[in-house]
């Protein structure tokens, strides 16, 4: 018999806890193993039951439970959490605190029933990832990989490799000579594509980026209405300015632009300046905004003046299009398996030989500084 994905539910009202539990248990692949009325009880049950995925319904009556997102990270960073709420502001806050998926529901009694398919699909996706992570987890190997990566990036005179952590990719080398060659190049723009696990990953790297960096355009898979607040929250953490994309805006050094939810983002070049072009239209690779759309535009317009980075995420959005940037002469980087919450998009990009360098999240900015900052 197939093992079911275990779910912990956090919901303030007992009646609604029962409704949500019944909804989840209606799936033959899911099983509610524990419920909690607040974050205090949830913390205890998390330790006891060790679920594969958590569903939190966040509303104004339990707003303090937002702190559970931070508490959960200190207890077990590998357990994904899906947040539902009828409050847009709370959804935005949850995104900034590292929720893995966000589902806006209505305020009526059947709010979760209406979004049943989306909720179940999200729990199945993240629960499956959690199970795979448990199986693959080897703390000794992980420690060795990070120690090796740390040695590589902190010993410039003896850089023999920037890591090959995926069996299908060729080992990438970056020595002093190659760094010097990269330093001679002029990079005008950095493009980042990220999905599941992105809010936490971006919160980790963006505060390290100096104002001297070229403009950064980021596609984080988020629906319409979420990205403005997400950008504001990141802006409060960073030296650079972080904002949501605006159509026809000129890209500036020291800025990061979060692609507006519900729209695709491209770039164009007018009078020597890169400008943002926001577009409506159908979903591409299952997403709007699509990483693939941005990367194709970067390949066509910025060409060898671009650095493209593909990070944690499910699926293949951007995985093939980043190869267009490589073919155009741009520099391509992928987040490694060990530091990716979901090693989907980077894995496919690596398999298809679309990546120049593979690095841990904790060393991403160190690599960029080595290339972009003259010393």
From Swiss-Prot:
Its EC number is 3.1.1.61. One of its GO terms (molecular function) is protein-glutamate methylesterase activity. Keywords: Hydrolase. One of its GO terms (biological process) is chemotaxis. Residues 6-120 form the Response regulatory domain. The keyword Metal-binding does not apply. It catalyses: [protein]-L-glutamate 5-O-methyl ester + H2O = L-glutamyl-[protein] + methanol + H(+). Residues 183-375 form the CheB-type methylesterase domain. The active site is at residues 195, 221, 317. This is Probable protein-glutamate methylesterase BB_0415. It comes from Borreliella burgdorferi (strain ATCC 35210 / DSM 4680 / CIP 102532 / B31) (Borrelia burgdorferi).
């Amino acid at each position: 018999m197939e093992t079911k994905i275990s779910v912990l539910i956090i919901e303030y009202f007992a009646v609604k806890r029962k409704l949500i539990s019944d909804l989840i248990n209606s799936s033959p692949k899911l099983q509610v193993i524990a419920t909690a009325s607040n974050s205090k009880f949830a913390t205890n049950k998390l330790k006891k039951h060790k679920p594969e995925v958590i569903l939190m319904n966040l509303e104004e009556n339990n707003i303090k439970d937002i702190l559970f997102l931070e508490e959960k990270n200190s207890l077990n960073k590998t357990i994904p959490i899906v947040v539902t709420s009828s409050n847009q502001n709370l959804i935005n806050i949850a995104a900034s605190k590292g929720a893995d998926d966000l589902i806006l529901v209505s305020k009526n009694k059947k709010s979760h029933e209406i979004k049943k398919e989306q909720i179940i699909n999200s729990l199945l996706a993240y629960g499956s990832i959690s199970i795979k992570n448990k199986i693959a987890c080897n703390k000794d190997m992980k420690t060795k990989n990070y120690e090796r990566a740390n040695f590589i990036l902190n010993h410039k005179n003896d850089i023999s490799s920037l890591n090959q952590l995926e069996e299908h990719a060729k080992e990438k080398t970056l020595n002093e000579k190659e760094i010097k060659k990269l330093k001679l190049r002029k990079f005008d723009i950095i493009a980042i594509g990220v999905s599941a696990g992105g809010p936490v990953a971006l919160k980790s790297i963006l505060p390290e980026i100096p104002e001297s960096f070229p403009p950064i355009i980021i596609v984080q898979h988020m629906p319409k209405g979420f990205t403005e607040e997400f950008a504001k929250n990141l802006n409060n953490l960073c030296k650079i300015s972080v904002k949501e994309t605006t159509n026809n805006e000129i890209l500036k050094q020291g800025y990061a632009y979060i692609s507006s939810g519900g729209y695709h983002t491209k770039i164009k070049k007018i009078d020597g300046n890169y400008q943002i072009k926001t577009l409506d239209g159908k979903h591409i690779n299952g997403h709007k905004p699509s990483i693939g759309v941005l990367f194709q535009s970067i390949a066509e317009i910025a060409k060898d003046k671009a650095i493209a980075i593909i990070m944690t995420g499910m699926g293949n959005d951007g995985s093939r299009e980043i190869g267009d940037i490589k073919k155009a002469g741009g520099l391509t980087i992928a987040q490694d398996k060990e530091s990716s919450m979901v090693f989907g998009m980077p894995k496919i990009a690596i398999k298809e030989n679309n990546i120049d360098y593979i690095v841990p999240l904790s060393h991403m900015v160190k690599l960029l500084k080595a290339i972009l900052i003259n010393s």
